Amino acid sequence: MTNNVITRFAPSPSGFLHIGSARTALFNYLFARHHNGKFLLRIEDTDKERSTKEAVETIFSGLKWLGLDWNGEVIFQSKRNNLYKEAALKLLQNGKAYYCFTSQEEIERQRQQALENKQHFIFNSEWRDKDPSIYPTDIKPVIRLKTPREGSITIHDTLQGEVVIENSHIDDMVLLRADGTATYMLAVVVDDHDMGITHIIRGDDHLTNAARQLAIYQAFGYEVPSMTHIPLIHGADGAKLSKRHGALGVETYKDMGYLPESLCNYLLRLGWSHGDDEIISMTQAIDWFNLDSLGKSPSKLDFAKMNSLNAHYLRMLDNDSLTSKTVEILEQNYNKLLRKLAYRKEFEGNTERSTAAYIDIREDASTGLTYKLPLTVELPKKFKVSEQEIGYIKQAMPSLLVRSATLLELTRLAQIYLVDSPIIYNQDAKKIIENCDKNLIKQVIENLSELEQFDKESVQNKFKEIAAANDLKLNDIMPPVRALITGMTASPSVFEIAEILGKENILKRLKII
């Protein structure tokens, strides 16, 4: 099937949009776009207990952020049960399925018995071939597939090759529950057929499902879509990706400061290649993508490579875009903190602008930033970076950029230029300030106060003079000065920062000591 290609992404809305699921969506999107076909979105929410509206919105926002736009309306399985029920009854009428009245307790008893006997358990229902005339009337049955007892099922996988499963290893799976709702297996097959899916591209953890679904396809007499089961993403240690390996959800990567173009490029290269090309735009990916270039081995998540790739895409943005994105994150996280503080009753009535009146944003690890805000009786309702501060950030952007691999790192450095908020000192900076020569800092303040020209070169020359007068090297003076001005121990050039912020702001920060 190559004409009128239709692929689908079919996540279960039970949590975040997993990074592995995002890659699956990307591959389906690229394959469809490469063939001028359709990329459809289906929400598999048949499990009512685990499915949430919040998870659905997370899936939508994650796909939109990545730029993976789908065709047509979203299909919700929870709204299609009548279609599934009709399909199950059709199999029943054709002798391909049967009513089963066996209780779950009896099935569990048989399962436990097989376990005790160290036997592989396949449930064989006593109702498979019984005459309907003896069906009990006081028990609601399930509908089970009448899987062939003999022969085998062959999965023709474009990546894995031919995978043969003996029918004796496939149970008579439930198609319709006793309450009339469809199971995942039935819904998937009916939907793929009804939606006209031509190619199924998904993780190889679905390979066992494929055999069971193939049995349903055969029972209906449906044409089977082309199947491609791709290896899962693993952690750097080679184990299956889990929380201990780092971020799992797409939204988290967004919060960590990765660009969507960068993440798509990185995910594309996890299991697919085009020669030695590493930097691949979405346009190129659509032109080049094919199933023949998929790898058979699991790919390992590598944050160093991800950061390197993201740094490349950051440098492709112009100054205005970088400044705009940085300011947006600053405002989002400041306002997130304000909303959080609005519920902190222990700070009500605290009017002192002292250390005790600050709360560290590090308590909220999801932002990744280290803001502190003064607390007064009335917290500001909304924080906004001033036009002056935006100007500072824009001017400093080239030097901030060379030290950043993500927008979050860029934003952390940009805090240096927020002159209307208190300076933030990290722990190392605090130690340097506590142990520094206070008299030397006073000399620095006095000398800088006398400067008429406060450009980078003039400030640097003045520091050289101070160092010489005290028989010191420039590197002996700069650590505490840097700590006081930036709150950090590593930053862009202090002389450049001084030129951008100006004398008044620099002296204000130095005088804190």
Curated annotation (Swiss-Prot):
It catalyses: tRNA(Glu) + L-glutamate + ATP = L-glutamyl-tRNA(Glu) + AMP + diphosphate. Its main location: cytoplasm. A motif ('KMSKS' region) lies at residues 240-244. GO terms for biological process: glutamyl-tRNA aminoacylation. Its EC number is 6.1.1.17. Disulfide bonds: none annotated. It comes from the Bacteria. A motif ('HIGH' region) lies at residues 11-21. It is found in: Cytoplasm. InterPro entries: aa-tRNA-synth_I_cd-bd, aa-tRNA-synth_I_codon-bd_sub2, aa_tRNA-synth_I_cd-bd_sf, Glu-tRNA-ligase_bac/mito, Glu/Gln-tRNA-synth, Glu/Gln-tRNA-synth_Ib_cat-dom, GluQ/Sye, GluRS_core. ATP binds at residue 243. Gene3D superfamilies: 1.10.10.350, HUPs. HAMAP family: Glu_tRNA_synth_type1. This is Glutamate--tRNA ligase 2. It comes from Rickettsia massiliae (strain Mtu5).
